[in-house]
Amino acid sequence: MGATGSGPFENDDALDFLDEVHDLPRQDRAGKILGALDVVLRATDYVEAPVMCEAVAGAAAVGASVNPAASQGEPYLPEWLAAEPLPTGDEELVEKSRQVLRRAVRSHDNEWWELWEEAGLGADVTASCRRALAWLGDRDD
């Protein structure tokens, strides 16, 4: 049975991506997430939903590592993040995570957003991205 929900970890693409991250040696995990963030941030045209989904999951995983107490209770939060958080001293990783979460809720050239909006869940995914932004210390105001 697949996972499907508006939270950053509540879908199969996100969970599969984070499983791939977890399977890497700890020192390579941030690089894998940074790669997913960069794909979205460097995109000059339409971003497909699975690509955005991986980037959002990676950004939220960084946020959960920055502020584990605030992210507790988030549906499908990978258990390994509590025991093996991502490095939070990497300001580039944190800032790019913020940028991706902001980009995710913009409709321009963004299939991920379009699908949520068509399903009537745009407000829900906006709230989940804002929650993850708050974990990163950004209120997004």
List the model feature ranges, each with a label.
Residues 14-18, 55-62, 114, 118, ...:
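Amphipathic alpha-helical elements of HEAT/ARM-like alpha-solenoid repeat scaffolds that form extended
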Residues 35-67:
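Short, well-structured hydrophobic secondary-structure segments
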Residues 93-141:
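Low-complexity intrinsically disordered segments
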Residues 24, 28-31, 53, 88, ...:
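Alpha-helix boundary/N-cap detector
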